[in-house]
């Protein structure tokens, strides 16, 4: 493969792959079992995949081997014989330094699978996969300030990560007679990942390191919450919370992990090994056919997933939002001084409540769900088909603030009903 994003001499790289399979059911010794297991194949593959899709959104430039200099973007100075004749000059600024010794990012991919057919009705597929990714482009974190790079910290290929999991699917088709038949299908995927090598600062506390933990989006970091403050006296006798607003009764109380008497970002830690990206995804559906009629349903869902709602729910004013009734009814107040209230106190400005919007166990929610995705009834005739379809019919989830499959700012999925005709000529 070749790319223009890399310097000459590193633009082309070879990425080999190999695969092998054995159809065991084709062997003579399998003949006694063929009426039960009519097909069995064991397969495996290993290969290297390259990518030049460095993290553009994260700050890398398209041509990573060039410095980025902005004329007139730096500091300024006055020159001239007198104040009335001075001339203001602005120098250039370095917004990004070239990354040296840059290559393709690589993923070494291993897959081992089995394909199985039982009684000429049931098809089963299983895959185990493991990916090892290296040369990940990351902004250097362990970079001494004495080097003087200011706001243009270099990027380098210093990251390594691992992704591992398995996929399973099963499909069953059965013709009971000329009139009746059934198709049943299901799938299940589990995946997990972690940083193998991550450029990090020399943190003071061990819980601040991310190496060995799931990657961003697959975990949640935040503060550990001990409840809500009940009184000014409790606030005075607790660690000082330096999170933007002065704590008041009804505000969230955080745990001082390092014991220094202050709540700062040094007290943030891993609060869930699951993030908004699910580890588990699954789906199941069935189609029944009777003569010219067919009826199909499909469900999908995900698990091992959490949602952080702290700053997203934002019921705290100064954003032109209406206050939801369920928040008002379940908030901490003088009339409801419950240290385990579902929502902290309300206020008249967002700046007065920034203490309560930090990522924490208080705002962590279980994001698993099951969705009734589709229901379709159809009638087939000689030249086509008539059908009625419903999509996104229901969702079951412990998370009830918005659609658990979406972000809070995403346009919601619509429940739709369709009446259609398909014609064949």
Tell where the protein language model's regions lie, with residue ranges.
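C-terminal extracellular loops and terminal segments
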Residues: 152-162, 204-220, 271-283, 315-329
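Conserved small-residue
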Residues: 57-66, 175-276, 336
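Extracellular/periplasmic, surface-exposed regions of secreted and cell-surface proteins
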Residues: 1-217, 362-425
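Glycine-rich, aromatic-lined ligand/substrate-binding cores of catalytic
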Residues: 273-308
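Short glycine/proline-rich turn/loop motifs
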Residues: 91-94, 262-267, 352-360
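Extracytoplasmic gating/loop element in the C-terminal half of outer-membrane beta-barrel translocons
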Residues: 3, 247-249, 302-385, 390
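Conserved active-site-proximal loop/helix segments of enzymes involved in bacterial cell-wall
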Residues: 139-142, 263-265, 313
């Amino acid at each position: 493969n070749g790319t223009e994003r890399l310097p000459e001499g590193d633009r082309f790289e070879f990425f080999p792959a190999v695969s092998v399979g054995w159809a065991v059911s084709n062997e003579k010794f399998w003949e006694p079992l063929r009426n039960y297991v009519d097909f069995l194949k064991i397969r495996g593959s290993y290969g290297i995949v390259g990518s030049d899709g460095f993290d553009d959104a994260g700050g890398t430039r398209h041509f990573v081997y060039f410095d980025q200099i902005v004329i007139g973007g730096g500091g300024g100075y006055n020159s001239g014989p007198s104040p009335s004749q001075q001339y203001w000059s602005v120098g250039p600024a370095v917004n990004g330094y070239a990354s040296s010794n840059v290559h393709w990012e690589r993923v070494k991919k291993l897959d081992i699978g089995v394909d199985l057919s039982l009684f000429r009705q049931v098809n089963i597929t299983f895959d185990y996969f493991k990916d090892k990714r290296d040369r990940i482009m990351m902004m250097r974190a362990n970079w001494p300030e004495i080097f003087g790079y200011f706001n243009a910290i270099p990027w380098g290929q210093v990251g390594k990560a691992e992704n591992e999991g398995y996929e399973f699917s099963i499909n069953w088709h059965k013709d009971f007679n000329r009139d009746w038949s059934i198709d049943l299908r299901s799938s299940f995927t589990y995946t997990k990942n972690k940083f193998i090598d991550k450029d990090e600062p020399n943190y003071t506390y061990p819980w601040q390191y991310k190496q060995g933990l799931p990657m961003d989006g697959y975990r949640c970091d935040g503060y550990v919450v001990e409840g809500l403050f009940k009184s000014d006296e409790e606030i005075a006798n607790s660690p000082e919370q330096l999170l933007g607003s002065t704590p008041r009764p009804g505000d969230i109380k955080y745990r001082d992990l390092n014991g220094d008497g202050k709540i700062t970002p040094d007290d943030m830690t891993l609060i869930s090994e699951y993030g908004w990206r699910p580890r588990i995804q699954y789906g199941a559906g069935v189609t029944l056919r009777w003569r010219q009629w067919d009826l199909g349903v499909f469900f999908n869902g995900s698990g091992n997933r959490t949602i952080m709602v702290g700053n997203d729910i934002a019921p705290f004013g100064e954003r032109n939002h209406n206050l939801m009734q369920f928040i008002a009814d379940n908030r901490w107040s003088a009339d409801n001084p419950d240290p385990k209230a579902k929502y902290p106190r309300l206020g008249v400005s967002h700046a007065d409540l920034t203490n309560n919007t930090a990522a924490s166990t208080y705002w962590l929610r279980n994001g698993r769900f099951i969705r009734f995705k589709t229901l379709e009834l159809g009638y087939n005739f000689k030249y086509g088909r008539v059908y009625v379809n419903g999509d996104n019919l229901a969702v079951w989830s412990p998370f009830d603030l918005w659609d658990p499959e979406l972000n809070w700012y995403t346009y919601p999925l619509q429940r739709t009903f369709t009446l259609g005709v398909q014609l064949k000529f």
